[in-house]
């Protein structure tokens, strides 16, 4: 199994090959924390939501991958993504680089294997920082502590394991970007409205700047829009269940230090590589086309 994950400001959506490198744990993507969570799938999903709320965060949305896949005519084992976390824990990373918002709030994937066992997977704080190009270890501490608290409450008992290594994870060409002609609010709304046309749909919109009213400096306007394409997502979830951690797709919209609105979205080919899916898979091509179209539409280019 091999991998290359990459992040930057102005990558070409059509350029570059994905180089892959071995990872150490089968079924566990680079830069993640994976816990065994017993055999009760529904209770685990509920405990994750409660843990987020009880540790000072909020649940943004819950995505039932299995239900969405079923609606698309594909049967997969139970798989649910819980998106949410503490706004305060995100701020140190966002203050250094708003592109970190492409992987915030945290995403917790609960899935059940064919043997009935339930697992819980989440990105490590080191991964979120790495793909955003934030080298400062101190900026990751709040997110790491918050994630550990959620995991410890959702799956009580065993200590939270060490994250898998950041094999092949770099901040180069991970985030594709397009400059928008409008404000952050207008651009995010364009994204949402554009996504609500078949085959895509908007799943959630998060104002990440809203949580910055603490003693530290406020961050510039930053929003994230989550977008699903069930027809393309479902076959990928069936072939590579761990990719549920990175679906639905997300778009971060922010005001940069030159007062320009930017739209950034992870290159889905890099996401595919992280989960062992071929970059030329037709469903990956469909998601890439969706993302490019929506970004250009929101930017006012088309």
Model-derived segments and spans:
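Sec-dependent N-terminal signal peptides
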Residues: 1-3
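C-terminal motif of bacterial Sec signal peptides marking the signal peptidase cleavage site
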Residues: 6-9
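Bacterial signal peptide processing site
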Residues: 11-14
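Terminal, regulation- and interaction-focused segments at domain boundaries
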Residues: 16-70, 159-203
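Solvent-exposed, acidic/flexible segments
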Residues: 37-45, 62, 100-101, 113, ...
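Ser/Thr-rich, low-complexity intrinsically disordered terminal regions
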Residues: 41, 46-109, 193-252, 271
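Beta-strand/loop substructures that line and gate deep hydrophobic ligand-binding cavities in soluble
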Residues: 101, 107-133, 250-277
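C-terminal partner/receptor-binding element of secreted or periplasmic proteins
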Residues: 125-163, 269-302
């Amino acid at each position: 199994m091999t991998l290359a994950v990459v992040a930057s400001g102005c990558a070409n959506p059509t350029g570059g090959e994905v180089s892959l490198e071995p990872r150490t744990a089968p079924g566990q993507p680079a830069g993640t924390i994976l816990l065994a969570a017993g055999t009760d799938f529904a209770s685990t999903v509920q405990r994750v939501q409660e843990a987020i709320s009880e540790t000072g965060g909020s649940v943004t949305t819950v995505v039932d991958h299995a239900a969405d896949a079923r609606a698309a005519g594909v049967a997969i084992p139970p798989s649910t993504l819980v998106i949410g976390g503490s706004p305060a824990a995100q701020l140190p990373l966002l203050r250094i680089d708003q592109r970190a918002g492409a992987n915030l709030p945290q995403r917790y994937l609960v899935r059940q294997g064919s043997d009935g066992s339930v697992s819980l997977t989440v990105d490590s704080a080191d991964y979120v920082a790495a793909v955003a190009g934030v080298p400062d270890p101190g900026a990751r501490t709040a997110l790491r502590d918050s994630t550990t608290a959620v995991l410890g409450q959702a799956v009580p008992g065993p200590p939270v394991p060490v994250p898998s290594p950041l094999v092949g994870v770099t901040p180069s060409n991970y985030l594709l970007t397009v400059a928008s002609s409008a404000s952050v609010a207008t651009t995010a709304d364009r994204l949402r409205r554009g996504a609500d046309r078949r085959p895509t749909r908007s799943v959630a919109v998060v104002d990440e700047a809203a949580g910055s009213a603490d003693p530290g400096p406020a961050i510039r306007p930053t929003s994230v829009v989550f977008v699903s394409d069930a027809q393309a997502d479902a076959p990928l979830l069936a072939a590579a269940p761990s990719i549920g951690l990175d679906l639905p797709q997300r778009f971060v919209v922010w005001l940069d230090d030159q007062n320009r609105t930017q739209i950034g979205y992870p290159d889905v080919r890099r996401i595919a590589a992280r989960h062992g899916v071929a970059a030329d898979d037709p469903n990956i091509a469909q998601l890439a086309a969706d993302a490019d179209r929506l970004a250009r539409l929101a930017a006012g280019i088309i």
